[in-house]
Regions:
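Conserved S-adenosyl-L-methionine
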Residues: 1-3
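Flexible, glycine-/basic-rich loop-and-beta segments that form/coincide
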Residues: 6-63
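C-terminal target-recognition/interaction regions appended to catalytic cores
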Residues: 65-171
Length: 171
């Protein structure tokens, strides 16, 4: 995916079969015409509104500038990434830009970790909750690096959200 404009490390197996007698080289040449220089995480996050960490449990329905909105009027910065994703369309809404609850210890871990670091980083050694089981939980916490391709974002963030710590915000 990263070779085709998606700033995530998503690998896929694609099998193509045909009975038309089209040579596989022709198909792959056509696919690889769309290959491009990869975008990085910063390209996708650039210009989005700052959000604070949500410190109150159970406040999912609260919508404001600090915690985010399900839908809000928004002027996107016109960047190469924006043009690649949206073409000439002018998008005037930002959807589902919301934070989630984090406990105070996790917020402190997020603040201390440098970009690209995981649970084994010395900056969080004194507050790491899984110290004794570091071999198992070495990537329980992972702070994304804005200058890299992002790890694959999963649909079950409820369980893995500490593996996708925002690169420059403590959330």
């Amino acid at each position: 995916a990263q070779d085709f404009g998606v700033p995530q490390n998503r690998e896929r197996f694609i099998m193509i079969g045909n009975r038309l007698g089209i040579a596989p080289e022709i198909i792959f040449d056509e696919i690889f015409k769309n290959k491009r220089t990869p975008f990085v995480l910063y390209d996708a996050l650039e210009g989005l509104p700052h959000l604070e960490s949500r410190k109150e449990k159970g406040a999912k329905d609260v919508e404001n500038a600090e915690s985010g909105f399900t839908e809000v009027d928004f002027v996107y910065p016109i960047t190469d990434f924006y043009r690649f994703i949206n073409g000439d369309k002018k998008i005037c809404k930002l959807y589902n830009h919301k934070n989630r609850y984090n406990n105070p210890r996790d917020i402190e871990i997020y603040r201390r970790l440098p970009q690209g670091a995981n649970s084994l980083h010395p900056s969080i050694e004194d507050i790491m909750p899984y110290k004794k089981r570091n071999g198992i939980f070495k990537d329980k916490y992972f702070k994304l690096d804005q200058n890299q391709i992002c790890k694959t974002i999963t649909s079950h963030m409820k369980f893995d959200c500490n593996m996708y710590i925002h690169p420059w915000e403590s959330r």
